[in-house]
UniProtKB/Swiss-Prot annotation:
Residues 80-83 are annotated as: Involved in Mg(2+) ion dislocation from EF-Tu. Keywords: Cytoplasm, Elongation factor, Protein biosynthesis. GO terms for cellular component: cytoplasm. It is found in: Cytoplasm. The keyword Repeat does not apply. This is Elongation factor Ts. Belongs to the EF-Ts family. Associates with the EF-Tu.GDP complex and induces the exchange of GDP to GTP. It remains bound to the aminoacyl-tRNA.EF-Tu.GTP complex up to the GTP hydrolysis stage on the ribosome. The gene is tsf. It comes from Methylobacterium radiotolerans (strain ATCC 27329 / DSM 1819 / JCM 2831 / NBRC 15690 / NCIMB 10815 / 0-1). Pfam families: EF_TS (PF00889). GO terms for molecular function: translation elongation factor activity. Its main location: cytoplasm. HAMAP family: EF_Ts.
Amino acid sequence: MANITAAMVKELREKTGAGMMDCKGALNETQGDIEAAVDWLRKKGLAKAAKKAGRVAAEGLVAVESAGHHAAVVEVNSETDFVARNDAFQAFAREAAKIALNTDGTLEGLQTAHFPGATETVSEKLQALIATIGENMNLRRVTKLEVKKGVIASYVHNQISEGLGKIGVLVALESEGDVDALSALGRQIAMHIAATNPVALDASGVDAATVERESNILREKNAGKPDHVLAKIIESGLKSYYKEVTLLEQPFVHDGSKTVSQVLKEAGSKVGGPVTLTGFVRYALGDGIEKEEGPDFATEVAQQAGRA
């Protein structure tokens, strides 16, 4: 039997919202496999459909920079929140986002770009900052969005300084309508994305493995039903899943009576032209990164005193 730890139970509870004993039982049944335990709980009706989410444990900042028809978002990690509040670290994150506007939007392109006012590349500048501050840091990821006509709207949640925070969102709206009205609409949608964390724009963007996983869960939960009935249950279940996790089908957080798709359709008459949402990106600090938990306070003190 697998060794089931309290940390494993805690992680499963955070992912599913299921009770402690249910989580422990699921882990025992699946030999400690977290993802298999999620499915086991869902098949038993003990957990809701879970979006893809990793444990958020890294520190640092998400930085957003917009310039007309293009915008960029970057994530820079540090070991501690203390360093994330350092002026030099914040200046680096902000400048990295600005530099990303003039790159190809890839991480390598940003790392090798020239850092303004210095002889180094962005990567070399970060290494110099690490040497100065004395803590490991990482330029983790970057995304750039562009539109031909319209706006790239942005929103930063838990903002600690202009364009810097814990969650950064970009929304690309293609339209020939009024720019100010588009920007206001885009910001509302960006706030919606920050709150709901959709996995794709529409059903076509949900990866095949996820669709197969959802189908299998529905199939096992309804085992024994006639094939024609089961097919309808799976079809209905997937529609419900798409409404939960795809942006255009989600109920709009600012008006739950409408979907985001409906809001965009109605916006055309207000902004002076059809509006198409062509893309979005949501960065949550440390998304998917696991960090080792340190010793408790008493153990840490004992270690420092040489007694452990």
